Swiss-Prot record:
Protein name as annotated: NAD(P)H dehydrogenase (quinone)
PANTHER family documented for this protein: FLAVODOXIN-RELATED PROTEIN WRBA-RELATED (PTHR30546), FLAVOPROTEIN-LIKE PROTEIN YCP4-RELATED (PTHR30546:SF23)
TM annotation in the entry: none
Entry keywords, A to Z: Flavoprotein, FMN, NAD, NADP, Nucleotide-binding, Oxidoreductase
Species assigned in the record: Acidovorax ebreus (strain TPSY) (Diaphorobacter sp. (strain TPSY))
Enzyme type, top EC level: oxidoreductase
An example molecular function term from Gene Ontology annotations: NADP binding
Length: 200
């Protein structure tokens, strides 16, 4: 079976929750899954005063270990319609892997959160996916076979480009059951794709 990394950055815990759901989905397809986060670059005193969630249990990833996985699912919240600098800085350090083609043909995917329904979900997903394409990765999104993103009965995240959640202007909204189902669906689809590509 395939080996999957769920790599995320979470300021207030929404993406941490989504990452766990993505991992659940990947494990349900038989994949071996690690959940890791990128380093926080905001000084701890400032992060604490801004109420960042600093007690996240996932270990911090290193760039060099990325090539050890068959699939990498990247999650980060939006910052003005793109991924935040914490994730951008981490991926920028993967130039050596890019130069060697170390990630060519591996499976990639993205998930995100925004404060509002129209707060940059798709552009943030694109900002992540663009990096993964430059690394030579094969992209898996969240197809419309996941019916949860089609509903008009509730405020819900989700796009064909990846699973999403809506956090609210003050971060007061947690991922809904539908959004977590979307994350699990995408995680499972990534793992199933990696299993096919890598002989699982």
């Amino acid at each position: 079976m395939s080996k999957v990394l769920v790599l995320y950055y979470s300021t207030y815990g929404h993406l941490e929750t989504m990452a766990q759901a993505v991992a659940e989905g990947a494990r349900s397809a038989g994949a071996t899954v690690d959940v890791k986060r990128v380093p926080e670059t905001v000084p701890q005193e400032i992060a604490r005063s801004a109420h960042f969630k600093l007690d996240q249990s996932a270990p911090v990833a290193t760039v060099t270990e990325l090539e050890n996985y068959d699939a990498i699912i990247v999650g980060a919240p939006t910052r003005f319609g793109r991924m935040p600098s914490q994730m951008g800085s981490f991926l920028d350090q993967a130039g050596g892997l890019w130069a060697r083609g170390a990630l060519n043909g591996k499976v990639g995917a993205a998930f995100t959160s925004t404060a509002t329904q129209h707060g940059g979900q798709e552009t943030t997903l694109f900002s992540i996916i663009t990096n993964l394409l430059h690394f030579g990765m094969v992209i898996v999104g969240l197809p419309y076979s996941f019916q949860g993103q089609m509903t008009l009965d509730e405020v819900v995240g989700g796009a064909p480009y990846g699973a999403t959640t809506i956090a609210g202007g003050q971060g007061q909204r947690q991922p809904s059951a539908t959004e977590l189902d979307g994350a699990r669906f995408q995680g499972r689809l990534v793992a199933e794709t990696a299993n096919k590509l890598f002989g699982g």
